[in-house]
UniProtKB/Swiss-Prot annotation:
Expressed in differentiated seam cells. Expressed in the head and trunk. Its main location: nucleus. PROSITE patterns: GATA_ZN_FINGER_2 (PS50114). It comes from Caenorhabditis elegans. Disruption phenotype: RNAi-mediated knockdown in hermaphrodites causes their progeny to arrest late in embryogenesis (pretzel stage) or as early L1 larvae. Arrested L1 larvae are invariably uncoordinated, lumpy and somewhat short and stout. Also, the entire larval buccal capsule, the cuticular structure of the mouth, invariably fails to attach to the anterior-most region of the head. Residues 1-33, 65-122, 148-197, 240-264 are annotated as: Disordered. This is Putative transcription factor egl-18.
């Protein structure tokens, strides 16, 4: 009997101990909780330090702003604070165009930005100033060029006058000093006369311009006016000469692609004229229409759709307008050429020469536009 009682009381005591362990409250936290508490306390302390630094920085900025405001008020000029200059964006005034029923067209680019200008480089001649009427966006560029030419002429005259004074012997210095003003006036008149192109030079320049205009982009004879010692005449010669490099390159490309049996041809329609070359699924060379047709329909383009010329859209009207504008400018130049060539020598000679230079630059711009429209 005693053995049975002992065996029955053992499981009851084990269950009571297990319940006591479960119900006993945990006095000490585990190691994970301790580490978490340490991390939280560390991050809170770091955040508080950063907040203190930010507060200190804001106080310094406010002090600087107040000092700037006080100094600007005392001097009578309002200057923006550095915080406002950093935060406030710049307001750009935009002009709102009136709403109209007309269709807005994209502005046509006259010349590509990467294309090189056919005119020569005058950087060595004009103290680093590049004179290019095709790429000149500033409308006052011509006036700047003319002012630089005038300054260089005055400097040359001054140097010549100093050299003439140094070359004179000492015994004749008194007579030279007495006659200096008259000699200076005479030398200035002679230099102005030498700078102004004569009637024969103007006629030669007119012949070169007429030959260039009649050719319309073809190769012309390189006839230039006689050489002169003045820099203005050199600029006129450089501007008046046709852009032979661009014309020769375009003619060379045309002759290469015209009758060359080894030229690139489309493997589908056998054409050699296209705006861009592409590759089909097999890697063969195809023209732009055949490549786009295959990409869209996944089928080869029928040969019946072949056109041995590049389609031109809205080109004829623009070409006629540009050619008419070029003829008007050329006629105006022809009418104004005799008056500018035979103008006043003593007072208005330099002004007439500069007007001639400006007219020549306008004519070259018009002809470049006409040549660019003809290549489309």
């Amino acid at each position: 009997m005693s053995i049975s009682i002992m065996t029955e009381t053992r499981p009851e005591s084990a269950e009571q101990q297990h319940h006591e362990v479960l119900q006993r409250p945990s006095d000490e936290p585990c190691s994970g909780c301790k580490q978490l508490q340490k991390d939280v306390a560390k991050t809170i302390s770091m955040v508080m330090e950063r907040m203190d630094k930010l507060q200190y920085r804001l106080d310094e900025l406010l002090k600087e702003n107040n000092e700037l405001k006080s100094s600007s008020v005392s001097s009578g000029k309002a200057s923006p604070s550095p915080a406002e200059s950093r935060s406030s964006p710049k307001l750009v005034e935009t002009v709102v165009a009136p709403v109209s029923g007309a269709r807005k067209r994209k502005p046509k680019e006259r010349s590509p930005p990467a294309a090189a200008s056919p005119l020569p480089d005058f950087s060595n001649l004009m103290n680093g100033f590049m004179f290019d009427p095709l790429n000149m966006s500033n409308p006052n560029g011509m006036m700047q060029l003319l002012s630089m030419v005038q300054q260089q002429q005055q400097q040359q005259q001054h140097h010549q006058h100093i050299e003439n004074q140094q070359s004179v012997s000492p015994p004749q210095s008194k007579s030279v000093k007495i006659e200096d003003p008259m000699d200076q006036d005479v030398k200035q008149e002679e230099s102005e006369r030498s700078d102004i192109p004569t009637a024969t030079e103007a006629q030669n320049l007119l012949d070169a311009l007429t030959a260039q205009f009649s050719s319309n982009g073809q190769a012309t004879s390189t006839t230039s006016p006689p050489s002169s010692s003045s820099q203005v005449q050199a600029v006129i010669e450089a501007v008046a000469t046709p852009s032979s490099q661009s014309q020769d390159s375009s003619m060379f490309e045309k002759t290469e692609t015209s009758g060359d049996p080894n030229a690139a041809r489309c493997s589908n329609c056998r054409t050699d004229k296209t705006t861009a070359w592409r590759r089909d699924a097999e890697g063969k060379l195809v023209c732009n229409p055949c490549g786009l047709y295959y990409r869209l329909h996944k089928v080869r383009r029928p040969i019946e759709m072949r056109k041995n010329h590049i389609q031109q859209r809205y080109r004829r009207k623009n070409k006629e307008k540009e050619s008419s504008a070029a003829t008007q400018i050329f006629n105006q130049l022809l009418t104004q050429m005799p008056t500018m060539a035979t103008g006043g020598v003593s007072t208005d000679g330099a002004i007439n020469t500069f007007n001639l230079l400006e007219q020549i630059s306008q004519f070259t711009q018009a002809q470049e536009l006409m040549n660019s429209s003809a290549t489309f």
